[in-house]
A protein has these predicted regions:
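Disorder-to-helix initiation segments
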Residues: 5-9, 356, 360, 372-379, ...
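A structural-propensity feature for long, helix-poor, extended segments
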Residues: 400-446, 541-550
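Conserved phosphate/anionic-ligand binding catalytic regions in large, soluble enzymes, centered on
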Residues: 7-9, 85-92, 260, 367-394, ...
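Amphipathic alpha-helix face/heptad-repeat signature
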Residues: 382-383, 414, 421-428, 467-477, ...
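Amphipathic, well-ordered alpha-helical segments in soluble domains
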Residues: 65, 363, 389-393, 435, ...
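Long, contiguous binding/interaction regions
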Residues: 1-362, 369, 447, 455, ...
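Amphipathic alpha-helical interface segments
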Residues: 181-183, 432-505, 509, 521
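Preference for long, well-ordered alpha-helical segments
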Residues: 111, 121-125, 134-137, 481, ...
Length: 563
């Protein structure tokens, strides 16, 4: 899975779009990141910017944005309602996919160190990036705000984590942190009553509801020995919620903020709201996602509802997303477009023409054209994807077969493995063509000087190695798929045994076809040790595939004969 992090810097300027545009231009200049949102606040005189990308590129874009803000925002002239202590006030990093919080913290520290060292701005690390418990809370770091910063920096206790303990009236200070993804999520109710919506909110939110003396609604709030209100905790951790009425929709909602999806996922919050609403004579009609959501959160929701139905989880990503959207009622108030609401989908390059997005006819015509790519490598990967798809189909049919209800999880597991291999092989369809194009590009490099010749040779060798590794991965994935195909012949729906057999033929063809590509590309490799090793491993994989193919076809023919 590709590593993605989100960055949400807050800049102390919300009235002059020309200033903000200069900052966001720096972000958009960085290859590998995508600017998702720019939210200007005039009253607060503050702008929240959201962008996403691969880790190194994100912290590069963040640094350039902070640098530009330091040049063009003068904090000595800033006025606004929101608490702040710097031109770039806060800059949190948020893990989205393929990366842990611990890894994200390291990137936050890397960014903080560079900002302090190169820009000479005092940096405080907060949330998960904090070095002390006291500094975990952003409010503690920002206490005193800009107006009290000069005095704060004189206090050794508040020495910055990075950068000088010197007050710069123009830039102020900055808080850089790492936090979990925040989800703003509203659950729709079939009522206009804010009081009833609040009752549901108090049932589920972490904070819960205040204890009252006498009447549970109007009674005096009970307080502890310190004079603080006493609360009965709600059912969900890392969840904030309140009830409100939305005039635009004419309904009451439970407005929810989920602060840690690993503790309380979206689908759990939805289900808990449904339970509370039903208990109070209300009905949840659907829900609304405010802002963006990681693909993982939507996939987990879809998989949860499939498990609840005792249905196979081994279906396509698109189908799982569709199940999640339908089950959560995300289309209740307005159409929900996954391409616009799921972060990973927003990052996809819509301009790139992928082979796997073509129709069958289009792909076939492209292969038959005078262009040398797609060639045997891409076709082998595609044939492999078709082969494992047949095995996955048999697993799904078996999972839903009448009388086999107690075996649905067994076949669902096989189908999930098949879907993963299918997706990997489909990626390799385009990767193989890209690898071929890289070789062509390398051969086209200039070779007039000795230095250019050396650089060209190195580029050709690197591209050739990639062009070997891609079809080799096709071989590995296709061979792994044959385990699924054999299992489906042995234990799957007997009515689909020939489908699994055809899948085995496809898988073995994919392996032999990909190995031809490995062998032909290996002839141009200078690294003899690597060449011999990869050819030896490839031969071993092909031999295993041939044996497995014979075993599977023997079983298929035996089962056909018995009918």
């Amino acid at each position: 899975m590709k590593q993605l992090i989100e960055c949400v810097p807050n800049f102390s300027e919300g009235r002059d779009m020309t200033i903000i545009k200069q900052i966001t231009d720096e972000i958009e200049k960085t290859v590998g990141v995508k600017l998702l949102d720019v939210d200007l606040g005039k009253a607060t005189n503050r702008t929240v910017v959201t962008f996403v990308g691969t880790p190194d590129e994100v912290i590069e874009a963040a640094f350039q944005a902070i640098r530009k803000a330091a040049d063009i925002i003068d904090m000595s002239k800033h006025k606004g309602e929101h608490p702040r202590f710097g031109g770039t006030d806060v800059c949190p990093l948020v893990p989205i996919s393929g990366i842990t919080m611990e890894e994200t913290v390291k990137y936050a520290h890397k960014l903080a160190e560079r900002v302090g060292k190169e820009l000479k701005i005092p940096v405080y690390c907060y949330e998960n990036a904090a070095f002390t418990e006291e500094r975990r809370n952003l409010a503690n770091n920002r206490a005193g705000e800009y107006e009290g910063l000069a005095k704060k920096l004189e206090d050794p206790h508040w020495k910055p984590d990075f950068g000088p303990a010197i007050f710069n009236p123009r830039t102020g200070a900055i808080a850089i942190g790492a936090r979990d993804f925040l989800i703003a999520y509203n659950v729709n109710l079939n009522t206009t009553s804010v009081r009833r919506a609040n009752a549901v909110a108090f049932d589920i939110r972490d904070k819960g509801r205040p204890v009252r003396e006498g009447n549970p609604v109007t009674g005096k709030i009970k307080k502890d020995d310190n004079g603080e209100p006493v609360y009965i905790p709600g059912t969900l951790k890392a969840c904030k919620a309140i009830g409100w009425y939305i005039e635009e929709y004419g309904i009451a909602q439970v407005s929810i903020n989920l602060t840690n999806l690993s503790i309380t996922p979206v689908h759990v919050a939805f289900e808990e709201a449904c339970k509370s609403a039903q208990k109070r004579g209300l009905r949840v009609t659907g829900s609304e996602l405010v802002g963006l959501i990681p693909l993982k959160a939507i996939m987990e929701a879809g998989q949860y509802f499939l498990r609840k139905q005792k249905r196979s989880l081994g279906i396509s990503e698109e189908e799982i997303v569709k199940i999640a959207v339908k089950s959560l009622g995300l289309n209740d108030l307005k159409p929900f477009n996954p391409k616009e609401k799921i972060i990973e989908y927003l990052l996809e390059d819509s301009k790139e023409q992928k082979l796997i997005d073509m129709t069958c006819k289009g792909f076939t015509n492209e292969t038959a054209s005078e262009s040398p790519a797609p060639g045997g490598g891409s076709v082998s990967a595609f044939v492999g994807a078709l082969g494992v798809s047949l095995g996955t189909m048999v697993a799904n049919l078996s999972s839903h077969k009448a009388g086999w209800d107690d075996r649905w999880e067994e076949f669902s597991t096989w189908a999930e493995k098949g879907q993963k291999l299918k997706d990997d092989l489909l990626i390799l369809v385009d990767e193989d063509t890209r690898a071929f194009n890289k070789i062509i590009e390398a051969f086209g490099l200039p070779k007039d000087t000795e230095e250019e010749k050396k650089a060209r040779t190195m580029a050709i060798q690197a591209a050739t190695k990639t062009a070997i590794e891609i079809p080799f991965r096709t071989m590995e994935n296709a061979l792994e798929s044959m385990t699924i195909l054999k299992a489906m012949v042995e234990t799957g729906n007997p009515n689909s045994v020939t489908d699994a057999g055809v899948g085995a033929l496809c898988a073995r063809t994919a392996i032999s076809g990909a190995f031809l590509n490995v062998k032909v590309n290996a002839t141009g490799l200078h690294d003899k040790t690597y060449r011999e090793e990869i050819l030896s491993r490839g031969k071993e994989l092909e031999e295993k595939a041939i044996i497995l193919e014979k075993e599977i076809l023997l079983l298929v023919n035996e089962k056909i004969t018995r009918k």
